[in-house]
């Protein structure tokens, strides 16, 4: 389908260059180029260019993300670029995107999800079950930390920052017995052979939106919104939006011990949610099912089940920790 086939904008697609705001990490650039390739395939006359930007999260590499605080650490500067007209769309990892958008911006497309699960990477151990009781494990996520500690209480957890290549290099240097990363990032960068074990949702429930790419743009930019229509994948969107509805009700960010994972099977959308103490001492779980069209209500329902079990107390303690 060529760009000129969409109503609401002129047929002179080639006269305009679509600018994509992206972070500069290898994974972010891969995702932005993937979106660019999808746009070129859908609209052969469209010119596309990447606009690299540095976010606050990219600069604060010495502090654990949980202590940096705030929402949108990896997206705010890209959103500012959209609002200032320096870019037309911004490409994000959905797990980094806050549940609320600045006025004038919205989520225009969610692409088909890659593997949403976490992956164990290790030279010496081929599975989580093989890890010694006192294993040294690297991960920057409170969500992963609470689930790992629950299953392996005697392990030592270390903060792991930087891009995928940097994290793998730290493992290769012998700093850890194992590290836990998102499977999607490893696969997208060609590191799938480094995966020792793909962790099931029962072992480690994924982050909200993990494995999905989102495209943000100005709400009033009718032309750009129309160009993005072929990239949108409704089944993925129903799952991710259910997860995000749960997170919104919990008032959670992407740096807190909250997990959410939705799956679509036929006309049934199921959602599992989790909130846990970072030390693994207590994990609250809830799940529910519904029709895909009720994704918002489904997310809220799972959140209410979690809150009824005391999730708000856990999150209050996490936010109060300096």
UniProtKB/Swiss-Prot annotation:
Pathway stated in the Swiss-Prot or TrEMBL entry: Porphyrin-containing compound metabolism; protoporphyrin-IX biosynthesis; coproporphyrinogen-III from 5-aminolevulinate: step 2/4
UniProt-listed Enzyme Commission number(s): 2.5.1.61
GO molecular function terms listed in the Swiss-Prot or TrEMBL record: hydroxymethylbilane synthase activity
Gene name linked to the record: hemC
Keyword Membrane: no
Known cofactor(s): dipyrromethane
Family: Belongs to the HMBS family.
Pfam family, one: Porphobil_deamC
Gene Ontology CC terms, in alphabetical order: cytoplasm
Protein name: Porphobilinogen deaminase
Function: Tetrapolymerization of the monopyrrole PBG into the hydroxymethylbilane pre-uroporphyrinogen in several discrete steps.
């Amino acid at each position: 389908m060529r760009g000129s086939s969409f109503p609401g904008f002129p047929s002179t697609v080639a006269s305009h260059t679509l600018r994509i705001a992206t972070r500069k990490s290898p994974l972010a650039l891969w995702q932005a180029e993937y979106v660019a390739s999808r746009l070129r395939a859908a609209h052969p006359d469209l010119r596309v260019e990447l606009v690299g930007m540095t976010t606050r999260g990219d600069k604060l590499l010495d502090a654990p993300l949980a202590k940096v605080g705030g929402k949108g650490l990896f997206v705010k500067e890209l959103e500012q670029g959209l609002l200032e007209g320096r870019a037309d769309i911004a490409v994000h990892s959905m797990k980094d995107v806050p549940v609320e958008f600045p006025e004038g911006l919205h989520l225009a497309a969610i692409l088909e999800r890659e593997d949403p699960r976490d992956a164990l990477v290790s030279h010496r151990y081929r599975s989580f079950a093989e890890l010694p009781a006192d294993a040294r494990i690297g991960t920057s996520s409170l969500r992963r930390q609470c689930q790992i500690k629950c299953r392996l209480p005697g392990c030592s957890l270390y903060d792991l920052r930087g891009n995928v290549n940097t994290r793998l290099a730290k493992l290769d240097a012998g700093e850890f017995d194992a590290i836990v990363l998102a499977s999607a990032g490893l696969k997208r960068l060609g590191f799938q052979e480094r995966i020792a074990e793909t962790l099931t949702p029962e072992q480690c429930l994924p982050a909200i939106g993990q494995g999905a790419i989102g495209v943000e743009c100005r709400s009033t930019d009718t032309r750009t919104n129309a160009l993005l229509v072929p990239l949108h994948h409704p089944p993925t969107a129903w799952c991710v939006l259910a997860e995000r509805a749960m997170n919104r009700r919990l008032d959670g960010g992407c740096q807190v011990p909250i997990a959410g994972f939705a799956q679509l099977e036929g006309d049934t959308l199921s959602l599992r949610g989790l909130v846990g103490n970072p030390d693994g001492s207590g994990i609250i779980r809830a799940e529910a099912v519904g029709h895909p069209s009720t994704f918002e209500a489904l997310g809220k329902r799972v959140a209410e089940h979690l809150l009824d079990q005391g999730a708000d107390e856990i999150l209050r303690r996490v936010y109060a920790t300096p």
